[in-house]
């Protein structure tokens, strides 16, 4: 859990903004959303495999666009 020490004479809003930023970097909200409901191991594997396929297609598209620009 991210912690933020409030500095002397620091406005609350600034400290809150720093805390929100540190939570975002730590991935707290995404982890909470992921754990909100139970996900079967097979569903998790399917989701991860689909994400991997999507990343691979995106990488291939970027690579092909890069090759097109070279010529």
UniProtKB/Swiss-Prot annotation:
This entry's Gene Ontology molecular function terms read: structural constituent of ribosome
Report the InterPro entries cross-referenced here: Ribosomal_bS21, Ribosomal_bS21_CS, Ribosomal_bS21_sf
**UniProt keyword terms in alphabetical order:** Ribonucleoprotein, Ribosomal protein
Task: Quote the Gene3D superfamilies the UniProt record gives.
Answer: Ribosomal protein S8
Its GO biological process annotations read: translation
Q: Which domain of life is it from?
A: Bacteria
**Gene Ontology cellular component list:** ribonucleoprotein complex; ribosome
Q: Which family does it belong to?
A: Belongs to the bacterial ribosomal protein bS21 family.
* Protein's name in the database: Small ribosomal subunit protein bS21
């Amino acid at each position: 859990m991210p912690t933020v020490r409030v500095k002397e004479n620091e406005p609350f809003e600034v400290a809150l903004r720093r805390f929100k930023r540190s939570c975002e970097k730590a991935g707290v909200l995404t982890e909470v959303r992921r754990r909100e409901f139970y996900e079967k191991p097979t569903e998790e594997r399917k989701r991860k495999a689909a994400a991997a396929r999507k990343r691979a297609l995106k990488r291939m598209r970027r690579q092909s666009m890069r090759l097109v620009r070279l010529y």
